[in-house]
């Protein structure tokens, strides 16, 4: 597939090469993520479960505001980069998560779509002030070396999808649905384990699984070409495909806790909005956050 290049394919491959070159930069520290995964839940320490719940809350906010998946992916990247470097107490996680989310929103969304910090805090039902949020933003920025933008799995998913989609017969193109792939990526982001995968590997694992499920044999060669071009080993791809498959199976079951978008809709209903007092008057100010490095 990649050997015979159209002008559009050449542009896509140029973009892919740029992403591959930048991929290793601005990613979470795997050793830090492993520490979180191994932590016991005592109500004080950061754990994988708490991290995953926070990401689900960020996904609910993303859906509520209608933000792009790239915004959500970047917010998760920032959160995991910070958590993998710093020892964060559970009581500070909401402020950290919302700060990462707000940074991602301001970096990717149009300025007119960026909500006020006061509105974001109120809708999220957190009990901290705008000054707390701004202070946490500065801490996050310092710990990620002021590098907000990063290469994400969503960017790879877009490119990989574009490379294979146009090779399908016209009548079958609608079956390989990008929104479905986006939803699968969001589900994976809600599990900390997938932040240990390279963004390119996670994206290709999701796409390859979907192609297998649709029995698109004609795209197998294309996936193999992308895999080779991206220098992804067969072992790595198989390993992460199995984990993605397991995650999606669990996510589609009733046992899985899914993001609660309805809760946010209720919070800002007309009746509720009239009853809400300004957040400042019911604030419990956060204590100074110790900047302890892992």
UniProtKB/Swiss-Prot annotation:
Gene: Ccng1
Tissue spec. comment: Highest levels in kidney, heart and skeletal muscle.
Coiled-coil boundaries: none
Protein's name according to its UniProt entry: Cyclin-G1
PANTHER family referenced in this protein's UniProt entry, alphabetically: CYCLINS
Subunit structure: Binds to B' regulatory B subunits of protein phosphatase A (PP2A) following induction by p53 (in vitro).
Protein species of origin: Mus musculus
UniProt xrefs under SUPFAM superfamilies: Cyclin-like
Similarity section: Belongs to the cyclin family. Cyclin G subfamily.
Xref: Pfam families: Cyclin_N
Its job: May play a role in growth regulation. Is associated with G2/M phase arrest in response to DNA damage. May be an intermediate by which p53 mediates its role as an inhibitor of cellular proliferation.
Keyword terms, alphabetized: Cell cycle, Cell division, Cyclin, Mitosis, Nucleus
Tagged with keyword NAD: no
């Amino acid at each position: 597939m990649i050997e015979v290049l159209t002008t559009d394919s050449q542009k896509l491959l140029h973009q892919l090469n740029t992403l591959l070159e930048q991929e290793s930069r601005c990613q979470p520290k795997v050793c830090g993520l492993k520490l979180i995964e191994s932590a016991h839940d005592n109500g004080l320490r950061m754990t994988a479960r708490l991290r995953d719940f926070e990401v689900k809350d960020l996904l609910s906010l993303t859906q509520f505001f209608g933000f792009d998946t790239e915004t959500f992916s970047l917010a998760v990247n920032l959160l995991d980069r910070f958590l993998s470097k710093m020892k964060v107490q559970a009581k500070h996680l909401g402020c950290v998560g919302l700060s990462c989310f707000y940074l991602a929103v301001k970096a990717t969304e149009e300025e007119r779509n960026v909500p006020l910090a006061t509105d974001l805090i109120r809708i999220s039902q957190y009990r901290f002030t705008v000054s707390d949020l701004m202070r946490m933003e500065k801490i996050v920025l310092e710990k990620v070396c002021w590098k907000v933008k990063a290469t994400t799995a969503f960017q790879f998913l877009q490119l990989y999808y574009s490379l294979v989609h146009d090779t399908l017969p016209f009548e079958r193109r609608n079956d390989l649905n990008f929104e479905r792939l986006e939803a699968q990526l969001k589900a994976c982001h809600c599990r900390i384990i997938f932040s240990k995968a390279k963004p390119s590997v996670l994206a290709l694992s999701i796409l390859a699984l979907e192609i297998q499920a649709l029995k698109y044999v004609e795209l197998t060669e294309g996936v193999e070409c992308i895999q080779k071009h991206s220098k992804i080993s067969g072992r790595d791809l198989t390993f992460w495909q199995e984990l993605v498959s397991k995650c999606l199976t669990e996510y589609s079951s009733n046992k899985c806790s899914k993001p609660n978008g309805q809760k946010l809709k209720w919070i800002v209903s007309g009746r509720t909005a009239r009853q809400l007092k300004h957040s400042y008057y019911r604030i419990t100010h956060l204590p100074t956050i110790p900047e302890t490095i892992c």
